[in-house]
């Protein structure tokens, strides 16, 4: 997830999107630490999830309502964000599978769920905002 988001950051054209992705990458380091040390107090909590939701709302305010399906790949940055979304969804499913045998912090799973939505929103932003 971190690597593909780094690739997206290299290609997006909006500076605010670059900054948002970089912040997410730092959060992912915390999430990776949580997964590496299951059973300990999590670094990623509900405040991180709330922050993602607020970020999604902030970007969504600048977008037109969505009334059609989107075809991925309008720009290089958007394409990498589309791939990032798929990779994040895969990571979320892996966390759910892991939770069947290990004590996984629910906040980490919620974070990944919201992150995939943010990737979708950022891809739209890269495509639609000039």
Q: How would you name each of these model-derived features?
A:
Residues 2-130:
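Phosphate/pyrophosphate-binding loop motifs in nucleotide- or prenyl diphosphate-using proteins
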């Amino acid at each position: 997830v971190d690597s593909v988001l780094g690739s997206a950051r290299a290609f997006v054209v909006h500076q605010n999107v670059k900054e948002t992705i970089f912040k997410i990458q730092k959060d992912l380091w915390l999430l990776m630490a949580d997964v590496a040390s299951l059973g300990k107090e999590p670094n990623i909590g509900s405040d991180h999830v709330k922050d993602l939701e607020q970020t999604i709302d902030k970007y969504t305010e600048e977008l037109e309502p969505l009334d059609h399906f989107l075809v991925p790949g309008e720009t290089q940055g958007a394409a990498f964000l589309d791939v990032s979304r798929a990779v994040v969804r895969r990571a979320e499913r892996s966390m759910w599978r892991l939770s069947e045998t290990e004590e996984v912090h629910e906040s980490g799973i919620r974070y990944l769920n919201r992150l995939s939505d943010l990737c979708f929103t950022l891809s739209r932003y890269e495509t639609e905002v000039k």
